Curated annotation (Swiss-Prot):
Protein role: Catalyzes the stereoinversion of LL-2,6-diaminopimelate (L,L-DAP) to meso-diaminopimelate (meso-DAP), a precursor of L-lysine and an essential component of the bacterial peptidoglycan.
Designated name of the protein: Diaminopimelate epimerase
Biochemical pathway: Amino-acid biosynthesis; L-lysine biosynthesis via DAP pathway; DL-2,6-diaminopimelate from LL-2,6-diaminopimelate: step 1/1
GO cellular component: cytosol
Any one Gene Ontology molecular-function term assigned to this protein's record: diaminopimelate epimerase activity
EC number: 5.1.1.7
Lineage of producing organism: Bacteria, Bacillati, Bacillota, Bacilli, Bacillales
Any GO BP annotation: lysine biosynthetic process via diaminopimelate
Alphabetized UniProt keyword annotations: Amino-acid biosynthesis, Cytoplasm, Isomerase, Lysine biosynthesis
Amino-acid positions noted as binding substrate in the UniProt annotation, renumbered to this chain: 13, 66, 76-77, 165, 198, 216-217, 226-227
Quaternary data: Homodimer.
Predominant subcellular localization, coarse grouping: cytoplasm
Amino acid sequence: MQIPFTKMHGLGNNYVYIDLFDYAIDEKLYHDLAIQISDVYTGIGSDGMILIHPTTDADVGMRIFNKDGSEGKSCGNGLRCTAKYAYENGIVTNKKFHIQTKANIVEAEVSVDNNKVNQVTIDMGEPILARNEIPMMGNNDVKVVNEPFVVAGETQYITAVSMGNPHGVFFVDDIEKAPLETLGPTIEKDMRFPESINVEFIEVVSPTELNFRVWERGSGITQACGTGACAAVVAATLNEKVTKSHPIVVHLAGGDLNIEWKEDNHVWMTGPAEVIATGLFYYKEE
């Protein structure tokens, strides 16, 4: 089966995008297709696969699959790339429109120069802070803010935030010494998180800047995570390390995102989206 694709990235967080507006794929193949297409040796190579599809509830829909084939609910970098693709390929004609994910419907606004999208701003919605809605085991409706968290025999301190997908945020003094490769996979699969969790280590540079590294659920270390950057700013605000309603620059491995948690409780994200390649993927149905 020959499948047209576009590979895109948001600050290095790269996915293979498949346009289902003019092309149909049997849903039972999504899991295996995501695994095959994401393989760096025998596929295109990516952090996962995103399907751009019609929906009656918004201007465009997107479904996110990690490189292990599991389906995610939201992806900030994926939203920006989907917005760019939708505008540049005529799926939408207005610069402000709505995208549906498994988590929610978000508003996107594109900044255009010479008919090319160079920046995308997304209203990522309201953060979810109740423990049972992260979800995380324990006292149901209590916020998880700087809570002791024993892992690998050591006590870390976690702040948990959901931005449509779950994030465990840990603050460190030096981002270069963050135990991402060792604790990332351990925390991701910890039994205290029924749906597993994304893991972020954050260094506070100043009241307006954060350094950020991420271990993504189902994908491992990636260059960037948009929902994670939003969760990091919410967590930093809850821990009184930054101020609400002030733009915060989050320095990710792949570049910078501008995040603001506004007084209306919505978190806004602004950043770039880029096309890497287009082509045909030769899918072997197993």
